[in-house]
Design a protein with these regions (language model features):
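Positively charged n-region of N-terminal signal peptides that target proteins for export
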Residues: 1-7
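Domain-level detector of nuclease and nuclease-like folds
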Residues: 135, 139-144
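Generic secretory/membrane-interface signal
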Residues: 7-8, 17, 41
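C-terminal segment of classical bacterial N-terminal signal peptides
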Residues: 14-24
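Sequence context of c-type cytochrome heme-c attachment sites
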Residues: 24-130, 146-157
Length: 157
């Protein structure tokens, strides 16, 4: 009898702490904000990115081709040509998350909310990029003639 009472009393308490733990862990994850949020502190880099980086307006190409693509093909486009597609808080649709519709700053540098919350600390954002980072989308099979150095070192921002 005692054991049943203890189990009945402990179950709601245990569930409460589990919910709090899950919510706290989820809140600790950085979320996507969109490139305009980056521009507030990184205006010069943002302006260069918008002017020189082809991916800064990648949603236009997807919208033009969308009617000729299957849902699967469209999702494949989203994985590289939008920000955070398929990840928590990432791009969902042009209507629901328009601020993430292009391949923006956070595609390379990661979700920016913690970076902003911590006052711009470099420990909460990817500041040094490597060719491996680019290869997530720019693999040989996807882009035969991709030249990493001009984008990585040549003023994409």
């Amino acid at each position: 009898m005692r054991m049943r009472f203890f189990a009945a009393a402990a179950c709601p308490v245990f569930l409460f702490f589990m919910v709090v733990a899950v919510k706290t862990a989820h809140a600790a994850e950085a979320t996507y904000m969109g490139s305009k949020a980056c521009a507030e502190c990184h205006e010069e880099q943002y302006d260069k990115f918008k002017k020189y980086a082809k991916k800064a307006n990648s949603s236009h190409s997807i919208k033009v081709m969308a009617s000729d693509l299957t849902e699967g093909e469209l999702k494949e486009c989203f994985s590289c040509h939008t920000t955070g597609y398929g990840r928590p808080g990432g791009f969902k649709s042009f209507e629901e998350t328009p601020e993430l519709a292009d391949a923006g700053c956070e595609v390379c540098h990661g979700p920016g909310s913690k970076h902003v919350d911590e006052g711009g600390g470099v420990q909460s954002i990817k500041s040094r990029l490597s060719i491996k980072d680019c290869e997530a989308c720019h693999s040989e099979e996807r882009v035969d003639a991709f030249n990493f150095k001009p984008m990585l070192f040549g003023g994409a921002h």
